[in-house]
Amino acid sequence: MILKYKVYERLELRGIEPFNTLIGSFRYNEDANKFLKEKQKETYDNNTVRKSFFVFVERD
């Protein structure tokens, strides 16, 4: 069984359904976490927009 670690960006805009965008796919957890750590610096939350990131694990 092979695991894939997929990093998603979640964007929530006021009045619009939140949506997720795949921004990276990795074979190893360490690589996904390094990428996520860098992207977390771009996380923000204000009155109109909330931007966050998360990792989803998928089995092949």
Where are the predicted features?
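Short aromatic-glycine-(Arg/Gly/Cys) micro-motifs in beta-strand/loop hairpins
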Residues: 1-22, 49-50
